[in-house]
């Protein structure tokens, strides 16, 4: 199964240029070129920034199965989706206490694996929410192991795990920027303690 994840920063934006004026798929846009080049069975989008009322505009995207999670907290914010040509069972969102009102996760189950795609909240000004998110995600990943299937977690984790994940080693060790904080990195590394590995 070939899976591609893409943080698109707005699926409706002109920069995506998905559709022609007659609403057909633009075969010259980056999305179409990516499909032609890689031919993925599954595409995951992060930061779609669209609302539920816009989802029907994307029905003609060349994937048979689609799962969207749009922000209900505010317009033009967050959002993720999973598009697939392989049938899946939609498991909804991670069990965050607010019901994932910001549209930050989608979970689907294929015959051979479970795929989780996330847009993890940035901790800047929201440290407590980020800690809650990390705790819920850890517990959910632990729980999913009971399915005895491969578990794939993808998306924007908003954390710098290793030096190779950032442009400057100095930023990683001397910064107080969100994503570089020690507790965020340690929380992320807890996933490895329960059998997950970091790939990129």
Question: Which sequence ranges carry the predicted segments?
Answer:
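Glycine-rich, phosphate-binding/catalytic loops in enzymes
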Residues: 20-23, 59-63, 132-133, 169-172
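Surface-exposed cleft-lining segments at the edges of enzyme active sites
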Residues: 96, 119-134, 138, 172-176
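N-terminal, active-site-proximal structural segment of metallo-dependent hydrolase catalytic domains
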Residues: 1-60, 74-78
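Active-site beta-strand/loop signature of hydrolases that rely on acidic residues for catalysis
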Residues: 3-8, 34-53, 115, 141-165, ...
């Amino acid at each position: 199964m070939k899976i591609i994840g893409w943080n698109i920063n707005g699926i409706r934006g002109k920069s995506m240029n998905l559709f022609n004026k007659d609403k057909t798929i633009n075969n010259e846009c980056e999305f179409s070129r990516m499909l032609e080049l890689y031919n993925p069975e599954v595409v995951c989008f992060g930061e779609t920034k669209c609302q539920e009322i816009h989802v029907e505009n994307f029905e003609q995207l060349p994937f048979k199965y689609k799962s969207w999670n749009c922000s209900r907290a505010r317009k033009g914010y967050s959002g993720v989706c999973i598009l697939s040509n392989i049938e899946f069972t939609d498991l909804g969102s991670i069990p965050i206490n607010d019901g994932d009102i910001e549209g930050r996760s989608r979970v689907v189950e294929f015959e051979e694996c479970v795929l989780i795609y996330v847009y993890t909240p940035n901790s800047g000004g929201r440290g407590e929410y980020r800690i809650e998110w990390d705790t819920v995600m850890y517990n959910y990943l632990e729980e999913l192991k009971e399915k005895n299937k491969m578990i794939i977690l993808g998306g924007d984790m908003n954390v710098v795990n290793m030096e190779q994940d950032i442009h400057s080693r100095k930023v990683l060790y001397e910064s107080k920027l969100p994503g570089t904080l020690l507790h965020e990195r340690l929380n992320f590394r807890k996933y490895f303690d329960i059998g997950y590995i970091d790939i990129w």
